[in-house]
């Protein structure tokens, strides 16, 4: 099964998941063609395997009608020429090793504390971010310097619990800012300015950050129109077409509308806290690592830590993880299409989903 077969796969589903797929997704396939001059043929064959591979290209477009997130899939994009230094994996390992004894390795003297102090977990301790982008903006510094060290469900759970305690302390200080957001930018390619393993946390007021609030409103609109839960239907579709699996109650799937390469989504049950998806996050992280991903972004969406008068009843805790590419690659993975139109994706979600069944090094 591949993404180019998506339309026929949906058409063959049982009535309930097929109806959900048709409610949520708009799927279309188009063909791109070109005429290659004879002078280019040797280069094309070397780069793409054959001239036929580029002469006629199938592009699959998937749009989530509810959230208006969308992706354009063409696996040929993965073979396009880019400036990638050799041995970038070895260079990453050397960079991690050479940055030991950085300020995060001495948290007490190398980082500031928040005005409520530090929160300590078994595997990490919090600090206050020096250059903030919200009133409370903290860092969860891992005890282990290497951000690529294996991380099982227990380790994920410990980090999530420590970060949550930080957020609760922040909300006690600033009750008007109950919206908690957690992120993990792993390595410089993914936006991490410090190599040492760390997550970041913020709390904000007024409403949740726009992308979280937009998702909440979209799900409510879907429920009002169809009398169905958007997140349950989203899972129903992905599971039915073979893109998802469950682990310890968490629903993990390779999304049909990834923001960028190899995006995995982890859904909890409504009312559950983030600890309930620790095993799912560990599975997703291990799946990415099993296919060589080292630079990734992770975001945690959840309801506010105090009632705000809005309807969050059916909003589940969820995590999104995405591959940001080879740290040694000088070509940026984000361009004008991703910023202003739709994501252009080279990785097939069905291939990504297979990695969920054979992750290593979690």
PLM ranges: what are they?
Residues 1-362:
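HIT superfamily nucleotide-processing domains
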């Amino acid at each position: 099964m591949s993404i180019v077969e998506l339309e026929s796969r949906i058409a063959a589903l049982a009535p309930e998941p097929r109806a959900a797929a048709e409610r949520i997704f708009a799927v279309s396939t188009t063909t791109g063609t070109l005429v290659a001059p004879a002078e280019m043929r040797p280069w094309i064959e070397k780069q793409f395997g054959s001239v036929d591979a580029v002469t006629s290209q199938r592009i699959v477009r998937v749009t989530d009608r509810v959230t208006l997130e969308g992706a354009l899939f063409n696996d040929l994009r993965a073979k396009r020429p880019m400036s990638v230094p050799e041995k970038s994996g070895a260079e990453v390992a050397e960079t991690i090793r050479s940055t030991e004894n950085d300020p995060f390795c001495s948290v007490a003297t190398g980082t500031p504390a928040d005005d409520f102090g530090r929160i300590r977990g078994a595997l990490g301790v919090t600090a206050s971010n020096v250059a903030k982008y919200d009133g409370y903006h903290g860092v969860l510094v891992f005890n282990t310097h290497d951000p690529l060290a294996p991380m099982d469900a227990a380790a994920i759970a410990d980090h999530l619990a420590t970060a949550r305690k930080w957020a609760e302390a922040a909300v006690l200080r600033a009750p008007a800012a109950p919206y908690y957001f957690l992120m993990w930018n792993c390595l410089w390619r993914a936006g991490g300015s410090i190599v040492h393993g760390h997550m970041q946390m913020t709390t904000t007021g007024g409403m949740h950050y726009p992308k979280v609030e937009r998702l909440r409103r979209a799900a409510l609109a879907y429920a009002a129109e169809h009398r169905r839960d958007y997140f349950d239907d989203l899972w129903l579709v992905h599971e039915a077409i073979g893109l998802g699996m469950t682990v310890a109650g968490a629903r993990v799937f390779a999304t049909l509308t990834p923001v960028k390469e190899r995006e995995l989504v982890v859904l909890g049950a409504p009312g559950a806290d983030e600890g309930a998806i620790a095993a799912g996050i560990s599975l997703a992280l291990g799946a990415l690592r099993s296919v060589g991903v080292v630079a990734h972004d992770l975001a945690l969406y959840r309801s506010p830590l105090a009632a705000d008068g809005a309807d969050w009843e059916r909003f589940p805790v969820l995590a999104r993880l995405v591959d940001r590419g080879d740290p040694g690659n000088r070509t940026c993975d984000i361009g004008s299409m991703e910023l202003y139109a739709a994501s252009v994706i080279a990785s097939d979600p069905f291939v990504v989903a297979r990695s969920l069944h054979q992750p290593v090094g979690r």
